Amino acid sequence: MARIVGVEIPNDKKVEIALTYIYGIGRTRAKQICEATNIDPDKRVRELNDEEISKIATYIQQNFKVEGELRTEVMQNIKRLIDIGCYRGFRHKLGLPVRGQKTKSNARTRKGPRPSRIKKKK
């Protein structure tokens, strides 16, 4: 397995797909990276030589925030919303949907499982 930006990417996948294993890189960015580094996106990772792997790694480090750096930025943004006390921060703090969705019947993912009820014996 090749190691790019601290992430082991699978050898048997095409470069375009394998790059999406890195947090912060989706299909569109993976295509951009392949285009910018002149690497065929349909090539398998095991077919890449060390020079091509290092070319991809340096391009990603210079142009994108990925992995830990991106995760910390997202967490800091959420923390900032909570600290300033805005509506979105309040919703984050309560663990409810942030973007205006209804919560009367749905939103189980954000709310978590329903509290269990104890049945009375007759």
Swiss-Prot record:
Keywords: Ribonucleoprotein, Ribosomal protein, RNA-binding, rRNA-binding, tRNA-binding. GO terms for cellular component: cytosol; small ribosomal subunit. Residues 101-122 have a biased composition (Basic residues). GO terms for biological process: translation. Residues 98-122 are annotated as: Disordered. Transmembrane segments: none annotated. InterPro entries: Rbsml_uS13_C (IPR027437), Ribosomal_uS13 (IPR001892), Ribosomal_uS13-like_H2TH (IPR010979), Ribosomal_uS13_bac-type (IPR019980), Ribosomal_uS13_CS (IPR018269). One of its GO terms (molecular function) is tRNA binding. It comes from the Bacteria. Part of the 30S ribosomal subunit. Forms a loose heterodimer with protein S19. Forms two bridges to the 50S subunit in the 70S ribosome. Located at the top of the head of the 30S subunit, it contacts several helices of the 16S rRNA. In the 70S ribosome it contacts the 23S rRNA (bridge B1a) and protein L5 of the 50S subunit (bridge B1b), connecting the 2 subunits; these bridges are implicated in subunit movement. Contacts the tRNAs in the A and P-sites. Belongs to the universal ribosomal protein uS13 family. This is Small ribosomal subunit protein uS13. It comes from Thermosipho africanus (strain TCF52B). The lineage of its organism: Bacteria, Thermotogati, Thermotogota, Thermotogae, Thermotogales.
